[in-house]
Each structure stands twice: as C-alpha cells, then as structure tokens.
Amino acid sequence: SAASDVYKRQVSVNAKDLQAGKKLTLVKVDKKTGEKVLISSRTYKVSKDGTVTADTKDAGDYVLLNEKDAKVLSSKILKSVALKDTKKTVANGKKAKVTFDKNLNMENVKKITYTSSKKSVVTVNKNGAIVAKKAGKAVVKVKVTLKNGKTKTVKMTIKVTK
C-alpha cells in the first residue's frame, strides 16, 4: 500500500480481558480530553490464541473494553442525554430550537429524530427547529440513538401563546 494509506493506531486492552471467547468493544480516546467515545455497536471476540482483530477507519488511540466497562460507559453517556430546556413558551408564528445539555458529547450520537405530539400546534424539523402554529400545548419528543445502538427519548413541552 502507498505511504499515504498508512495510519497510526494505538490500542490498549487489559490483559485479563484477552481470554478466548470474551467480547470486547472498541472505543476511541479523545486526545484532548481523554474521554472515551463510541464508534459503533460492533463487538469483537477474542480468538483462541488471545488476539483480537478490530477494524478502524481513523488514526488515533483506541481502547478495547470488556462487556461490563462498555455497559458502564454506555450508561454514563445515556445519562448525559438531556435537554437544556424541558419547557418552553413560544408566541404563535415564532420559532424555537431544541438544544441539548452541554454535557452530551455529540461524537457519541449516531442519529436524532424529533416528533411533535400535535403538529397543528407545533412542528419540528429534522434539525430540531420548532415552529409555533397556533395557541395550545404540544410535546416534542427527541429520540437520541448512540453509535452503540442504545437509545434514549427526552421530551420538551411547548406552550404556544397567541
């Protein structure tokens, strides 16, 4: 392969996790913060000789986590899925935006879907932009899917005034 195709990857793993048949999850380590970031829902099985073959697209530092540590990381990330505001009042005809709490690292997010409980009162687009249509109340549901496939739904109640 050409020299331009060579990437440096450093992978860390706890030696006791390299037992044949164990499943490990590959996560990337943010060089600036040291934070572990999800890259996919895929798990890697340790082979009989104690080796693991993992595919990565990007250069960087990675860690292989055992199932327990991967669940702890996933739970921590799911807890960070929160909205800045769970209630908002918007005047009819005006716009608002769904914003996430600053603790959510968007690098862990694969997909976000937004839905309105009453499209006659409030509409919301794929980017979280809200438009107030008429006076009333509606709930905007925000479903966040992480790169490991886990999901969490959070809600924002919108009151539209005349």
Question: Predicted regions span which residues?
Answer:
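Short, small-residue-biased leader/transition segments that mark boundaries at the very start
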Residues: 2-7
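Surface-exposed beta-strand/loop patches in extracellular or lumenal glycoproteins
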Residues: 8-19
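Exposed beta-strand face motif in extracellular beta-rich ectodomains
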Residues: 22, 60, 136-140
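Beta-strand-rich binding/interaction modules
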Residues: 23-28
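Solvent-exposed serine/threonine-rich low-complexity stretches and specific carbohydrate-binding patches
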Residues: 38-46
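C-terminal beta-strand-rich structural cap/linker in extracellular carbohydrate-active enzymes
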Residues: 51-73
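Extracytoplasmic soluble-region selector
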Residues: 68, 72-162
